[in-house]
Amino acid sequence: ADLANGAKVFSGNCAACHMGGGNVVMANKTLKKEALEQFGMYSEDAIIYQVQHGKNAMPAFAGRLTDEQIQDVAAYVLDQAAKGWAG
């Protein structure tokens, strides 16, 4: 996966709601490692599925982003979660 591309995709498509790994709509459903683990989302496959299909207030990005962009952003989210979203 291309983490630099994932960062670019995140910035352009995800950061409005998930800046710094947070969640402006549902405060407990963050992209922080603990929350991802708690909700069974701490894997690339789980994140890819969520990005593709959306859930609740989160829109589906399948058809808006390529499979490669979605894979890259999932890898970026996991990488950032492991680093505590410290940059």
From Swiss-Prot:
Binds 1 heme c group covalently per subunit. Belongs to the cytochrome c family. PetJ subfamily. The gene is petJ. One of its GO terms (molecular function) is heme binding. Keywords: Electron transport, Heme, Iron, Metal-binding, Photosynthesis, Thylakoid, Transport. Pfam families: Cytochrome_CBB3 (PF13442). Monomer. Gene3D superfamilies: Cytochrome c-like domain. One of its GO terms (biological process) is photosynthesis. The lineage of its organism: Bacteria, Bacillati, Cyanobacteriota, Cyanophyceae, Synechococcales. GO terms for cellular component: plasma membrane-derived thylakoid lumen. Functions as an electron carrier between membrane-bound cytochrome b6-f and photosystem I in oxygenic photosynthesis. The keyword Thylakoid applies. Heme c binds at residues 14, 17-18, 58. Transmembrane segments: none annotated. It is found in: Cellular thylakoid lumen. This is Cytochrome c6. The keyword 4Fe-4S does not apply.
